[in-house]
């Protein structure tokens, strides 16, 4: 009792106006608000603002293999439901997992499997925030129930996907289909017997007759037991019925899962009377017939009762294996007894398994009842409609809906208007003072602020779930000045307006190749190469075995910009079927988080895809699981994978950006789509020390164009004062042959860089 009292105190001590912090911002860039940052919480990051006044989020350290496996299974189940990071159920699961692991609570896989997971998520966040603000709220003598290894293994088993059906399961399913047909026939005979009719039993087989007799005997016993309980009830205490006894009598406990969690819950279908007793024994005792449902109806004449009863039998009772009998009608109130036969299977997809559900179902069908029988249902509930009844649905409550909606709409509109006025005032004030602020700053504090941001990024805290932990986004305000930008733009536009200049440059470098470098390692595996062979001194080495074993060879080269110690790209050919394991080994070994795929779907079909279309696949020592696939435009899509090392059970997240419409040795119809694609890549999760793996069918032409455009645009952001496309292409070809393969691709580099300079100048003018 002291623990629950502490929880109540905790909930009332938390500010109701605090915003809920979203989880998963390391993997989804759009989760956090503008004033929030992604706080490294040891899982997938949590949105947090230091100005909100909320305490810093808790941090999970050193999750063991079992906890990581549990988290993976939860995420797999969410991915199977097409839940994204912003979904309420996803946020509920992440919040509950984090709180359970941090406070060592018993974990329940179905905790968030409710109709409105947002409510559970809100409760978890309130409790977690309160415990963080004041850990002394909980009583010292309340010991949390630690999760044992057996409990965790049992939870993981609940989350695992079901295995494929065996032959016995298939045969049992086929027999069950035949039994459904018999059940429908036998239900009609049982209904006829209950209604005192004389059905013709000659059409039934011997087996069906035996089943029918058994059902009637069981039904008779149930009715007798119910009557005996009513007669022997002492009005003071209800005897508990053990669950084992229910199973021996062929009865079934409803929602057994809930019974195991919170004790025995009577769903109202057993023929029992619940006595609500308050005060002394000599006070009034109110009884509720928990196996009866009543309807308050308005009838023009009692002839309308029969169509009403027939409608209830056909639409509610029969589809759910329920029996409605003992109908009583008095003073505009119709009541009936609800019972259920446990031996048959329900015919409805969503089974009604409580008297409350029956009452709600009747009220929902009140319009159909009025149309077919003329009866007007005004209220439904549990009981016989007398003083001890419990209303479930009533038309008297419906009139409140429109006023409540009106008040809500008015409130939202008023808040929106207030916010709009405040924003307009803030912008007007900002415009009036922007010039004065700019003169005071004179550009000095801007550089100091940028330097501070770089220092904080370099000293950032590492993530627990990956070896890389930074966000690489292009600088919001580029360091290039407007005058330099216009000079560069005029230079590029001059070349684009005179194609002969670009053609002359291309003729000078189209046959350029570095003859001083050797390719002996790649020549050993000639069958694994398409057209381009990587150089020996910058070939991507896998576990130091590239030159020894064909299984550890991948046609890929490290590409450097101005820092020879750190590769910016890994340029590779699209892996053949025999190179898929080496491809994923390369990604794992060199900490790659981003993969840029420039091969068309037609080219990918020539070899087996290195990623699964659905579910997961195992290649070598790695298991690859497809988490999501989003189509961002007609030209490209984005896939997200979980990569698991089967040797040490570590996992990482890999994002693939697939450009679909760029044919080999050609150019896209628009440079704009290439630039949008590049910006999307550069705004995604990338480690400070990890290269971007860029591949096309042969790993040369299209790969070279993408690397050249990205290198030149990145230099512009760093504030260089001149652009040399020819020197950039030669620099790339010094590291891998064939980078930028045709004159049209060379011209595309000019066009992309010119559009990017124009975009930067517009952004500078806007800001």
Swiss-Prot record:
Where does the UniProt annotation place the signal sequence? 1-19
Which membrane topology term applies here? Single-pass type I membrane protein
Q: Which InterPro entries match?
A: IA-2/IA-2_beta (IPR033522), Prot-tyrosine_phosphatase-like (IPR029021), PTP_cat (IPR000242), Tyr_Pase_cat (IPR003595), Tyr_Pase_dom (IPR000387)
Q: Where is this gene product found?
A: Cytoplasmic vesicle membrane; Perikaryon; Cell projection, Axon; Cell projection, Dendrite
Q: Which residues lie on this side of the membrane: Lumenal?
A: 20-398
Keywords (A to Z) from UniProt: Cell projection, Cleavage on pair of basic residues, Cytoplasmic vesicle, Glycoprotein, Membrane, Signal, Transmembrane, Transmembrane helix, Transport
Q: Does the keyword Glycoprotein apply?
A: yes
Residue ranges of domain Tyrosine-protein phosphatase in the record:
527-756
Q: Name one GO biological process term.
A: positive regulation of anterior/posterior axon guidance
Q: How is it modified after translation?
A: Proteolytically cleaved probably at a dibasic consensus sequence by egl-3.
Q: Which residues are glycosylated?
A: 26, 146
Tissue expression, as annotated, is: In hermaphrodites specifically expressed in neurons and in particular in the head nerve ring (ADE, ALA, ASI, ASK, AUA, ASG, AVH and AVJ neurons), in the ventral nerve cord, pre-anal ganglia (PVP neuron), in the tail (PHA, PHB and PHC neurons) and in vulval motor neurons VC and HSN and the vulval uv1 cells. In males, also expressed in neurons anterior to the nerve ring and male-specific neurons in the tail.
Keyword presence, Nucleotidyltransferase: no
Q: Where are its TM segments located?
A: 399-419
Q: Which domain of life is it from?
A: Eukaryota
Q: Phenotype upon knockout?
A: Viable and fertile with a reduced brood size. Locomotion is slightly slower and the expulsion step of the defecation cycle is often missing. In males, impaired mating turning behavior characterized by abnormal repetitive turning during the first turn. 50 percent reduction in dense-core vesicles in ventral cord neurons. Paralysis induced by acetylcholinesterase inhibitor aldicarb is reduced in 50 percent of mutants. Resistant to aldicarb-induced reduction in brood size. In a unc-64 (e246) mutant background increases dauer formation whereas in a unc-31 (e169) abolishes dauer formation.
Entry's Gene Ontology molecular function annotations: transmembrane receptor protein tyrosine phosphatase activity
Q: Tell me the protein family, please.
A: Belongs to the protein-tyrosine phosphatase family. Receptor class 8 subfamily.
Quote the function comment for this protein. Regulates dense-core vesicle (DCV) trafficking and/or secretion. Probably by controlling DCV trafficking, plays a role in the AVG neuron-mediated formation of the right axon tract of the ventral nerve cord. Involved in locomotion by regulating acetylcholine release. Probably by controlling the secretion of FLP neuropeptides, regulates the turning step of male mating behavior. Plays a role in preventing dauer formation.
* Name of the molecule in the record: Receptor-type tyrosine-protein phosphatase-like ida-1
What is the species listed in this Swiss-Prot or TrEMBL entry? Caenorhabditis elegans
